[in-house]
A protein has these predicted regions:
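Conserved P-loop
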Residues: 1-51
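Conserved catalytic network of the ASCE P-loop NTPase/AAA+ motor domain
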Residues: 6-9, 37, 58-61, 85-89, ...
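Short, ordered loop/turn segments at secondary-structure junctions
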Residues: 18-20, 71-72, 98-99
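Helical mechanochemical/support elements of P-loop NTPase systems and associated helical scaffolds
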Residues: 22, 49, 77-80, 84, ...
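Short, well-ordered secondary-structure micro-motifs
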Residues: 26-29, 54-57, 78-79, 105-107
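Phosphate-binding/switch loop-helix module in NTP-utilizing enzymes
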Residues: 44-96
Length: 157
């Protein structure tokens, strides 16, 4: 969601919250990230078939950035995801995936990972770039400073 807010500086964002819907933690995150600051540029949907998504994206002034949370819960398979991206080559698709043993869960998600230009893995509130355009090896973006402190072994006494 934090990335979605930043992307609002460059165009409209469609956040497809299939996994969380708009549950309490989603609403809390909307609050502490001050998503009201990008009201109108950050749109959230909680359901919709692939056909409905395609129809939405064909409309004039449709979102430039599409965040799908998550690939597994969306219920699409790999060929459908590829078709969606090929149908709208000027749009940016961001796929969120569930993990199993530090890898995207399911064969379709693993295949999708390898055709994406940029892969970002978030571990312990740190986002590591694993894509084709990585910066310094081992560098990361801090997603939530307090979360890093709370999950580290160096807790204040």
């Amino acid at each position: 969601m934090q990335l979605g807010k930043e992307l609002c500086n460059y165009g409209t964002v469609l956040y497809m919250s299939y996994e969380e819907k708009i549950n309490q933690s989603f609403q809390r995150r909307m609050g502490y990230l001050k998503m009201n600051e990008v009201q109108g540029k950050f749109r959230v949907v909680t359901e919709g078939s692939l056909e409905e998504v395609i129809a939405r994206l064909k409309k004039p002034k449709s979102p430039k950035f599409i965040i799908i949370d998550s690939f597994q819960v969306a219920g699409w398979d790999y060929p459908q995801a590829v078709e969606l991206m090929e149908t709208f080559p000027k749009k940016c698709f961001i796929w969120i995936s569930q993990e199993k043993k530090s890898q995207p869960m399911g064969g379709g998600a693993v295949r999708l990972k390898y055709i994406c230009d940029m892969k970002i893995r978030v571990v312990g509130y740190k986002a590591y770039c694993q894509g084709r355009a990585i910066g310094d090896p081992g560098s990361y973006y801090v997603v939530w400073e307090d979360g890093i402190i709370q999950t580290s072994n160096n807790l204040p006494k």
